[in-house]
Amino acid sequence: MSVVPQISREALLAQLRDAVGAAHVLTDDQATRRFRKGHRTGEGPVLAVVRPGTLLEQWKVLQAAVAAGRIVIMQAANTGLTGGSTPDGANYDREIVLVNTLRITGVQVIAGGDQVVCLPGATLDKLEQTLAPLGREPHSVIGSSCIGASVLGGICNNSGGALVRRGPAYTELALYARVKDDGTLELVNHLGIALGDTPEEILTRLQSGDYAEADIQRDTGRVASDSRYAQDVRAVDADTPARFNADPSRLFEASGSAGKVCLFAVRLDTFPKEPSTVFYIGSNVPDDLTAVRRHLLTALPRPPIAGEYIHRTAFDIGEKYGKDTFLLINHFG
């Protein structure tokens, strides 16, 4: 059922400008194009692209858009290959407010480096840099599909398809907003960190890192990574695949939410940095690769860190141009 817009577009735009400043509310077609056009798929018109600079600003933008009866699309790095963070065509029943969160950066190390709290604009590259001096690394070291991917975007889409040992990006510890059945907005704090009672207090304290070790709950009864996947993927003779889109067992609140809720932060496990060796195995016979895969998953004491099928053309391109890409990522992130 369509929701009837409650206020005019001019009134809503005024509220959005009051929340984040006029410079961060974009309405011109040229200014909004890079936000409303997907990396590979998806493009469409929007009422505005809004770029909040704090968690509290993000909350105010969300409040205004929901109260006004508009569609909200959340976006971070806009690097996804399958859509979801941009409009897809112009056949929507209401105007769209696209909220880009890249200005809200922040990675907070907790539990001696065993875990982190990531804000909406945190990228995998920044997270890796933060953890490197601690001898730790994140679930994903780099976006498997695009450079500059965001941490929260990965959680929303259960990313990490090449990761065999760690599995999909997953956590049950998150701070998010949802629209209740009566149409009102609710902030849900399932981070396992005591930050106060009101949205304003919770978001302001989290943004500034205003919490102590005593505020962090260790035994939450929830997990901050997918500990089952390594076992599931080794069941090579099972009737069901270990990994498939929208796996219900890996959909939990923020994880796999794909834009159905609005994320403000996630709490994630980190992992000891391990030495690794990369092997390239080539064959013209698919059965050879199947045999290799089954051996790696069943005969080794631990499954491989990661694995990927690469067709010949992609390998040749990587061999020719990969060094340039490596240097670019290494120096510029």
Spans of model-derived segments:
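N-terminal flexible segment immediately upstream of the FAD-binding catalytic core
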Residues: 1-67, 80-117, 143, 268, ...
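Short, conserved charged micro-motifs
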Residues: 9, 57-60, 126, 286-292
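General beta-strand structural signal in soluble alpha/beta enzymes
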Residues: 24-29, 51-52, 72-76, 83, ...
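C-terminal substrate-recognition/cap domain of FAD-linked oxidoreductases
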Residues: 35, 267-273, 277-333
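FAD-binding subdomain of flavoenzyme oxidoreductases
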Residues: 125, 132-136, 140-290
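Short, structural beta-strand-to-alpha-helix junction motif
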Residues: 54, 79, 115, 122-127, ...
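A common structural junction motif
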Residues: 20, 67-70, 135-138, 297-306
